[in-house]
């Protein structure tokens, strides 16, 4: 991670860390790196429903206009909506203003290249290098060569048309409850499922600039769980603030996470001969029950580091078309280039419609192993991988598990923590294994 770009673009508290001044520079230098070979490059900008979105959009637009770009403002739209439209409209770049599932005071800026994919580490490094130069030597067009800005609020409709084409048939007879996190999908999701003839009940669809992700959305699925039962819905679909994640709820109110959705969809796609190489890409944090369920269905799996960008990289490299994370970032590369909550919802609904089975029955085919994750604050998180005593206790626990469990000990990507995760046959065994390892990590390198 660099000075400005983290694991998912530039993030910070809006107007404190992520200031308009910084947003201007990100627009100017980011726009230049992505479009420098083009005369009057086209750049799309979308935002979620945060109050700070207008302020940051204004600064970003100014930065892009200063390099001569033609900016098209999409208004409130999901992150995957920007990604899709950037490629579909032959734009040189796309920008999304959002901090995803984070609280309202945060915001972020995320770029997409003309191919609809997130930037490479090298591109981000070049943007940072230019931003930190003592003198701004970028071209400064004048007169008729200055940039132009236009609104293209029809972009959302174009994206919805694309999504509707991914439905195998209409959803007549399915009662779906939607939780849109008071975010970017608040209008999109409601129209999408109504247009596909589902019976729709909604919550979290009244954004006021301040209530995004506030007790609603994919990070608070318990709210949707209660709503599904209250409305007697067949299933619930919860999106996050920028619409790139999906967590579902079955008709009984049970939460169905990203691993389960991935399993359900990949099994169905395999049965139709549409799963490339019968392989799914996931991260090391996916549940052991996920891998065992895939194995039973003859589906292979590839594991990556945590982060949807690493999942996408592995998919692109070897041509796989389904991947994702337990958190609900699910990528269907035949259709879009990034995690897409609405697209994932349609893939799940396609499966429900084709099988005629309730979501609870489909989800029950994957038996989740009890999982426990404990964070330990340490002096040097990177030393955990070479500590002999830690290695010894991990080896001891793995021997006891005898293949019926899994241990993962890794440094956090963003904080001075070591994450200790175990999965085992029972919750009691899980607790015991994690506590044994945590004890050794604390005594060897823990902070008091």
Curated annotation (Swiss-Prot):
Protein task: Catalyzes the conversion of glucosamine-6-phosphate to glucosamine-1-phosphate. Glucosamine-1-phosphate is used for cell wall biosynthesis.
Cofactor note: Binds 1 Mg(2+) ion per subunit.
Protein name per UniProt: Phosphoglucosamine mutase
Cofactors that this protein relies on: Mg(2+)
HAMAP family, sorted: GlmM_B
Domain of life: Bacteria
Source species: Bacillus subtilis (strain 168)
Stored Pfam families: PGM_PMM_I, PGM_PMM_II, PGM_PMM_III, PGM_PMM_IV
GO molecular function: magnesium ion binding; phosphoglucosamine mutase activity; phosphomannomutase activity
Gene Ontology terms describing biological process: carbohydrate metabolic process; peptidoglycan biosynthetic process; UDP-N-acetylglucosamine biosynthetic process
Key words, A-Z: Isomerase, Magnesium, Metal-binding, Phosphoprotein
Phosphoserine: residues bearing it: 100
Processing after translation: Activated by phosphorylation.
InterPro entries: A-D-PHexomutase_a/b/a-I (IPR005844), A-D-PHexomutase_a/b/a-I/II/III (IPR016055), A-D-PHexomutase_a/b/a-II (IPR005845), A-D-PHexomutase_a/b/a-III (IPR005846), A-D-PHexomutase_C (IPR005843), A-D-PHexomutase_C_sf (IPR036900), A-D-PHexomutase_CS (IPR016066), Alpha-D-phosphohexomutase_SF (IPR005841)
Family of the protein in this entry: Belongs to the phosphohexose mutase family.
Active site: 100
The EC number(s) this enzyme carries: 5.4.2.10
GO cellular component terms attached to this protein's record: cytosol
Binding partners and assembly: Homodimer, may form a complex with CdaA.
Residues bound to Mg(2+): 100, 240, 242, 244
Catalysed reactions listed for this entry: alpha-D-glucosamine 1-phosphate = D-glucosamine 6-phosphate
PANTHER family per record: PHOSPHOGLUCOMUTASE (ALPHA-D-GLUCOSE-1,6-BISPHOSPHATE-DEPENDENT) (PTHR42946:SF1), PHOSPHOHEXOSE MUTASE (PTHR42946)
